[in-house]
């Protein structure tokens, strides 16, 4: 395995190393901003984490279960309004959720426009046609993805991650699942910190440019060194946590307090879900 600390006669282009490091720093900055946002005054910030998790889950189920585009649009507007009332700007939602989800689900939903049989609304070459049913299927896929992603982001940005994990345990999620979520979240930032150290070490040794083939070999060496260090560190961290009595349960200094407004929010979310399910059974 190539040791990335070895000084080469030439080094990779500064812009390439800079872009990689900037991406890792952007991840760390996003985590800091999210932690700060969870402490701001806002509608969702003032609710009990258990009510937020259960309510978000109910609204996500409603978005998945609805058979009406108007109801789905109303749920999307509700999710956006909840985010805005919690100091999450539409620009942030567009940057972190809407554009990404639209691009990803759009590529998946695009074939449905012509593959779903139905009433043609637009003729295309080679005997193809965009159908009304295809447009409806694509709209449902995109709308459900946008709505559920907006609700999930609003939950995560307004609730510290340890509180989310504890709320999941309080709602009956298995300890193994919560443990996996907690360790995954923690090791993402462990890997990011290690990667940032490697990029900075390489950047300090820049003396020129590498050929594309040499740059790829160097990137492979950095990736291998990162994986090796992360594997060793993860084992050490896990053993240290076990030695300190960690068994997968989430313990916080402050206990949750369920207040009347938390109950009201939970009842409202449950009523929306029940209304969507009832409407779907009455008007299939």
Swiss-Prot record:
Lineage of the organism: Bacteria, Pseudomonadati, Pseudomonadota, Alphaproteobacteria, Rhodobacterales
Subcellular location: Cell inner membrane
Calcium among keywords: no
Organism: Rhodobacter capsulatus (strain ATCC BAA-309 / NBRC 16581 / SB1003)
Protein name: Nickel transport protein NikQ
Function (record text): Part of the energy-coupling factor (ECF) transporter complex NikMNQO involved in nickel import. The complex confers nickel uptake upon expression in E.coli; can also transport cobalt with a very low affinity.
Coiled-coil spans in chain: none
Record's bilayer topology term: Multi-pass membrane protein
InterPro entries assigned: ABC/ECF_trnsptr_transmembrane, ECF_CbiQ, ECF_transporter_component
Pfam families found in the cross-reference section: CbiQ
Family: Belongs to the CbiQ family.
Single GO cellular component term: ATP-binding cassette (ABC) transporter complex
GO annotation terms (biological process): cobalt ion transport; nickel cation transport
PANTHER family per UniProt: SLL0384 PROTEIN
């Amino acid at each position: 395995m190539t040791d990335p600390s070895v000084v080469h006669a030439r080094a990779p282009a500064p812009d390439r190393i800079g872009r990689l490091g900037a991406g890792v720093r952007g991840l760390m900055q996003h985590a800091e901003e999210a932690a700060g946002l969870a402490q701001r005054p806002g509608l969702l910030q003032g609710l009990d984490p258990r009510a937020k998790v259960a309510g978000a889950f109910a609204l996500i189920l409603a978005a998945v279960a609805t058979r009406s585009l108007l109801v789905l649009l109303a749920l999307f507007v509700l999710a956006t309004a909840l985010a805005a009332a919690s100091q999450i700007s539409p620009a942030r939602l567009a940057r972190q959720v809407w554009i990404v989800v639209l691009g990803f689900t759009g590529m998946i939903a695009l074939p449905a426009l012509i593959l779903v049989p139905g009433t043609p609304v637009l003729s295309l070459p080679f005997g193809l046609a965009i159908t009304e049913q295809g447009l409806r299927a694509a709209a449902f896929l995109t709308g459900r993805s946008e709505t559920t992603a907006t609700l999930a982001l609003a939950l995560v940005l307004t609730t510290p991650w340890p509180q989310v994990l504890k709320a999941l345990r309080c709602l009956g999620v298995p300890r193994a699942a919560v443990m996996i979520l907690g360790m995954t979240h923690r090791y993402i930032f462990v890997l990011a910190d290690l990667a940032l150290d490697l990029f900075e070490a390489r950047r300090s040794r820049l003396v020129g440019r590498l050929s594309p083939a040499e740059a790829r070999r160097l990137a492979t060496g950095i990736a291998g060194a990162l994986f090796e260090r992360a594997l060793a560190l993860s084992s050490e961290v896990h053993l240290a946590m076990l030695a300190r009595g960690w068994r997968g349960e989430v313990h916080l200094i402050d206990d949750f307090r369920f207040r009347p407004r938390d109950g009201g929010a939970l009842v409202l979310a449950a009523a929306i879900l029940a209304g969507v399910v009832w409407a779907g059974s009455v008007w299939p």
